[in-house]
């Protein structure tokens, strides 16, 4: 059984399957027009485990996914960084995401357990990752 845990919620096997089904429903058209491809969770974990441990332990480190999709890499970062830091600190000070598709940003925030009251809410934004100014503040314009 696959269970992923964040600081505020659990993602059960059923929830993971629901997310997979949603992605399939997006259809080939969206993939053709946007080039949208999601990195599988197991590959995200392998990539994050390649980050040097001293960087993972650094409470001042920042991690950016400039094409975050629905948050696979961000969720994996949250899981691994929470082994070293308080999950609130990870969400509010360490991880950042940008994606062009608004529904992906919404899903990523939900998967991270973010609410509009959280500082980290403003660290996952809907924007063009190639032209965004990369200033993550509480008043996004």
Residue ranges and their predicted role:
Residues 2-141:
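SAM-dependent methyltransferase catalytic region
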């Amino acid at each position: 059984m696959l269970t992923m845990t964040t600081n505020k919620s659990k993602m059960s096997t059923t929830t993971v399957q629901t997310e997979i089904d949603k992605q399939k429903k997006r259809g080939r058209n969206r993939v053709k027009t946007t080039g949208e491809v999601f990195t599988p969770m197991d590959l995200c974990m392998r990539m994050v485990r390649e980050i040097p441990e001293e960087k993972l332990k650094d409470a001042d480190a920042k991690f950016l996914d400039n094409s975050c999709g629905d948050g696979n890499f961000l969720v994996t970062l949250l899981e691994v960084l929470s082994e070293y830091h308080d999950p609130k600190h990870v969400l509010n000070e360490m991880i950042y995401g940008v994606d062009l598709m608004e529904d992906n940003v919404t899903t990523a925030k939900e998967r991270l357990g973010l609410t509009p009251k959280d500082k980290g809410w403003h660290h996952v934004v809907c924007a063009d990752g190639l032209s965004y100014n990369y200033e993550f503040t509480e008043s996004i314009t």
